[in-house]
Each structure stands twice: as structure tokens, then as C-alpha cells.
Amino acid sequence: KVQDAAQKAVDTRADTEAMMVVIRPSTGEVLAVAQTANADKKGDLALTGLFPPGSTFKMVTATVGMQHGLVTPDSTVPCPGTIKIGSRVVHNYNDFSLGNVSLTKAFAQSCNTTFADVSSKLKPGELKSTAQQFGIGQDYKIDGLDTLTGQVPQADELVDRVEGGFGQGKDLASPFGMALVAATAAAGKTPTPTLIESHKTTVKNTDAPTIDPPTIDKLRGMMRAVVTSGTA
């Protein structure tokens, strides 16, 4: 039933390369993998296609910012229509501006400029290591599925950290990888994805620590705001 529902959902965008992956957060069970016929022409894009994750990646940026004490959900942050950081000029959609608002509101309204600013204050490698805590960059060997999660660079250069903060530049993720990110937020730790219950998934690069529960709780509240008062 989940597979049928997922396929019907992506087929409403049949003229595009639409994809969906559904993972049960509590167990890691892959419940559905669906994509349109246009996506099928290019292979298993839902599982192995790598794309800039865009604003969905702000979950990672918000988390790393909170982990390193840069922000809290209630922090007052700038959301100008445009911002120049180093050599990079970052724009919000249609250059909308909210002025100074809480991080939660900036997250709910998807302020690129806010998260570029937060990310610019990170050290090289911090965004990458937090992405790994969500499963991005992990290597899974799943019986019955070939998958790629994505890749986030070390970002030694400021411009790479700025662009990475709102899911652009060199950040790449698959729909499968972003399904893991959402499942991690729901479960509090990254579930090990499985397709066949009796077949164990092999995981490489498992040294990423679990995100602390208070930070996950704060992230969930911000994600809820996207639905109740934001862009969802």
C-alpha cells in the first residue's frame, strides 16, 4: 500500500523527474521507492541519483549550528533578501526579506541568507561531520538495492561553507539519502536501512556519533513550524 501511494504521488508530476523514498524511522525498513517514467529513463535516480539538496539540507545546517553553540531555535538571526559573504552573494527566493527574526521563523520560511550566514561561521569539516550523523556520506550495502547517500565536502574554502549551508555548491544527496536525514530526525539516530528483514545491511563509515537528544528535539520543533506556519 505504501508503494502504491508513493507511486501515485510521484505520478502527479509525471512530466518531471519526480522521485520518492519512504523509510520507517524506527526500523530502517525501506517501505517504498517510486519515480516517474521520465526519471526511469536515467536509471534508479531515487536511490543513486545525486542532486543539490537545496533547502532540505537546512536541517543539517540548523543542527550543526546548535551543536556548536552558534544558534538556538529562539536566537535572533538576520534574514535579508541578499547577503554578501566573502565573494559570494546569496539570494532568497525572489529576494524576500524578513529582517531580524528567530531561527525557527527563518527555518520555516526557508531563508537562504540566514543559513548561509550560520554556515559561514563553521570550521572546515563541521558541516560534513554533521551530515554524516544524518547518514549522508555513509556507505550502505543493502541486499536487493544499490544506493548512494550523497557527499558533503570538507569545505576548506569559505565560499564552499557558505553555499553548503543552504544545500547548494558542492553538497550532493540522493532522495534515498534525504529520506535517511528525515528518518534520523524522527528516530533520533540514523536507522540502518534494510529491504529484506532476514538480510543484514553492511555499513561503512560508522564512526559518526549520534546527535544528542535535546538538539534533535529542537530540530523537530523547527521542522514542525515549516508545516504549521512556513513554506510546506
Region locations from a protein language model:
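Beta-lactam-recognizing serine transpeptidase/beta-lactamase-like catalytic domain environment
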Residues: 18-43, 68-232
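Extracytoplasmic/periplasmic proteins that interact with beta-lactams or build/remodel peptidoglycan
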Residues: 1-19, 40
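Gly/Ser-rich catalytic serine loop of serine hydrolases
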Residues: 48-57
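Extracellular glycan-interaction surfaces
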Residues: 63
